[in-house]
Amino acid sequence: MHVICNLLRAELSAHATTLRSFAAVAAIISAMNLAMSSGSATPAIAVCILTVAFLPTSLFAQDERAHLDTMYSILPVTRAQFVIARYLCVVLVAVAATLVGVVVALINDAVRGPGAGVLPLSVAGVAGLAVAVLGVIVAIQLLLFFSLGYTRTGMYAYGATMALMFAFGFLIKKFPDLTATIIRWAGSAWTGVLGPGIAVAVLAVSAAGSVRLYQRRNL
């Protein structure tokens, strides 16, 4: 565990510039969504959380540019430890984005009032639902990156993320019953508990697969 913690610190240090740039972009997107929202700020939580879906692409692109994968290969760490550290890095950013989104939404609602939104949304419900969706997207991305590398999957992973988001919006418009179900989930505080649980389970399965596939790769 000590090695993984040190590796995680090295990850955060090596990708500090990328993480700062990502945080700035996420803040701008969330602020724009918040400014355009006339009702409650609760939906802005989902926007803040889902921006993390684009982080894995940036991390692995930086690995390729700076040859960090080569550096990690000569360090006294196993590939499994590197995989776990990368997953923990993304999880930490996701947790930070969730906390920031929730705090900003609560402060906004306290200052401006909850708004006149007609949807019965819960802060915990929206956050939990967004975390579950993010967990699935990130789990797929990381599995692809570790098994095939950024060069072979970079644009495909980015495109798949965009396609999933557009497909989700299309399904909501096409199937009203699905929309009602999602709104019901977003309005339940229990979703705030189940969502992170689903994300953790999916990421655990993805990490196990990534470890096996990454160990077989010829770097």
Please describe what each predicted stretch is:
Residues 1-67, 85-219:
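Hydrophobic alpha-helical transmembrane segments of membrane proteins
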Residues 68-72:
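Short extracytoplasmic
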